[in-house]
Amino acid sequence: MGDRVTVGIVGASGYGGVQLVRLLLEHPKVDIVYLGGEGSAGRPYTELYPHLQGRVNLTVEPVSVEVIRDRAQVVFLSLPNGIACQLAPQLLEQGCKVLDLSADYRFQDLQTYTQWYGEPREDQATAQKAVYGLPELYRDRIRQSALIGCPGCYPTASLLALAPLMKQGLIEPNTAIIDAKSGTSGGGRQGKINLLLAEADNSLAPYNVARHRHTPEIEAICSDLAGQSVLVQFTPHLVPMPRGILATVYATLRDPGLVREDLITIYQAFYRHSPWVNILPPGLYPQTKWAWGTNACFIGIEVDERTGRVIVMSAIDNLMKGQASQAVQCLNLMMGWPETMGLPQVAFYP
């Protein structure tokens, strides 16, 4: 595709979109040539995000498959659920590579999608072509695909914590409990009462208990890894901070003789080719601040010998590894570039 790749972003006005813009501006192999969105069409992008003055000279345009086709080789879709599935088939037909940040192409079984998201779908053939965009698990498939269904933020943190346990049969698979906490940016940029400072500050609250839409996504990938149907218990919480996810996973070990050091060695081996996953040494547990602004995931491991359970803690930036930078990581793989290319390596600290 030549030395540089032209990229369009549809849904550029949201938090996911602006993270993509920030990352792709610094990417050595990419040129942003199109920013699309219906609600903000006609407005200079710097009117939406003034901090990008002098860096972005594009105006947000109405969404047009023909315009995108003529300009962009790769398209990121950062749209609400149920919209990407209307655009992706058309873009693929025009020869574009597509990375979808919504839930539309995370499921091979569209009945599951319809059950949890309430949207009937008629694009089963397209969904079958999609690859789940978690590079640490599906790196080789991503390299060969033209359509990536990028994971949700909670599933990313949860699955990176669970994958070695599920894949290697180290736990009773249906005993997994995920307690996850996310910053307020996970709710998007549109005004919501529970995300107002007066509502969210100095408070910690669970939400969508036993019915969060990321549950079937986690279960589908766990089932694939375990080679059997898996159910998980997943409870998300809202934390009064702008970004970050900490997922704490509990599960019963099949071999109660496994100790913490054994599991750390297993995790290090499992992720030995994954530059963004950091397995912490014994007694050190992850903090969300360590991942701020990066594509990193920090994983800490503990074993409670008294209960026979393993406890795995996983910290990511929900807008980065949980959304935009993971999509860019997938782009790197699709194009045959190093998967670290153009992505921040070190967090802002403190």
UniProtKB/Swiss-Prot annotation:
Q: Name one GO cellular component term.
A: cytoplasm
What is the annotated localization of this protein?
Cytoplasm
Residues at the active site:
153
Q: Which UniProt keywords apply?
A: Amino-acid biosynthesis, Arginine biosynthesis, Cytoplasm, NADP, Oxidoreductase
Among InterPro entries, the record links this protein to: AGPR_AS (IPR023013), AGPR_type-1 (IPR000706), NAD(P)-bd_dom_sf (IPR036291), NAGSA_dehydrogenase (IPR050085), Semialdehyde_DH_NAD-bd (IPR000534)
List the EC numbers from the record.
1.2.1.38
**Principal subcellular localization:** cytoplasm
EC top class, as a word? oxidoreductase
State the reactions this protein catalyses.
Answer: N-acetyl-L-glutamate 5-semialdehyde + phosphate + NADP(+) = N-acetyl-L-glutamyl 5-phosphate + NADPH + H(+)
Record flagged with keyword Metal-binding: no
| Keyword NADP listed | yes
Q: What's any GO biological process attached to this entry? A: L-arginine biosynthetic process
Q: In which pathway does it act?
A: Amino-acid biosynthesis; L-arginine biosynthesis; N(2)-acetyl-L-ornithine from L-glutamate: step 3/4
One function term, GO molecular function aspect: NADP+ binding
Q: Which domain of life is it from?
A: Bacteria
User: What function does this protein fulfil?
Assistant: Catalyzes the NADPH-dependent reduction of N-acetyl-5-glutamyl phosphate to yield N-acetyl-L-glutamate 5-semialdehyde.
What family does this chain come from, according to its entry?
A: Belongs to the NAGSA dehydrogenase family. Type 1 subfamily.
Q: What is this protein called?
A: N-acetyl-gamma-glutamyl-phosphate reductase
